[in-house]
Design a protein with these regions (language model features):
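Catalytic-domain carbohydrate-binding cleft regions of carbohydrate-active enzymes
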Residues: 1-237
Length: 237
């Protein structure tokens, strides 16, 4: 059902070998975490043991980080819901599990900013949440209006929220109409000047095929995309 920590051996018969191959080719791997359903609280000893053991087993394979994809909010409950949201509580737990695994490698955590849900601001930024990893603004659409919101979200979060490593699902994630090359170009231009440049991998949105691979677009569009991608890396210190 797409949850849990078991490896799909039909598609990955040798996960350790796959991880090694990726690293040999300069690719870092971030696993997306969707765990089972439960009504237990986040500090329940059995739940802590379950997540710690399973996350650690995958880290031993060489995984470079975790995408904490809101799932703890749907499966566990914060014991301090009035002051610490489920999103932030999950960030704390996942971060501690990563940190306890190794002190010589900087593993990283991608997590949802708890003040915004699916690109829409819901509350003031969390004081606690700003401490943890790379954050993103949730499952957003690909339309121009959402791109406009993301520019505002990025400025507000990186300044008022004091969380410098913010990111968006570049190109959008859901409910898209047929996507134009011009619209995808605008997303890349925005992303190139954002703290984190991350194109979302969804290839079909709202029943319409939507290719996110830059090299599949026209030669003219590729030239523009390459220009902005190169600009980003030229600006990096």
């Amino acid at each position: 059902d797409g949850t849990g920590y078991d490896i799909d051996t039909a598609n990955f018969p040798d996960m350790a070998g796959f991880v090694n191959w990726a690293h040999e080719n300069g690719v870092m791997l971030l696993f997306n975490d969707h765990t089972h359903k439960t009504d237990k609280q986040a500090l329940d000893p059995e739940e802590l043991k379950y997540h710690t053991e399973n996350l650690t087993n995958l880290l031993k394979l060489g995984v470079d980080g975790w995408w904490y994809d809101r799932n703890w909010g749907y499966t566990l409950h914060s014991p301090y819901a009035d002051s610490i949201t489920f999103t932030t509580f999950g960030e704390v737990l996942y971060n501690d599990i990563l940190a306890s695994y190794t002190s010589v490698k900087r593993l990283f955590l991608l997590c949802n900013a708890d003040w915004v849900r699916h690109g829409h601001v819901e509350s003031a930024p969390s004081v606690i949440g700003r401490r943890y990893g790379i954050q993103w603004t949730g499952d957003i659409t690909s339309e121009a209006m959402q791109l406009r919101r993301e520019v505002v979200n990025m400025v507000e979060k990186t300044t008022a929220g004091a969380s410098p490593y913010m990111s968006s699902d570049l190109g959008g994630f859901k409910r898209a109409k047929e996507q134009s090359e011009a619209m995808f170009t605008r997303w890349i231009q925005y992303g190139a000047l954002s703290p984190v440049f991350r194109i979302h991998s969804t290839m079909e949105l709202g029943g319409a095929k939507y290719d996110k691979l830059p090299y599949t677009y026209s030669a003219e569009t590729q030239t523009v995309l390459k220009t902005y991608m190169n600009l980003r890396y030229n600006l990096l210190p």
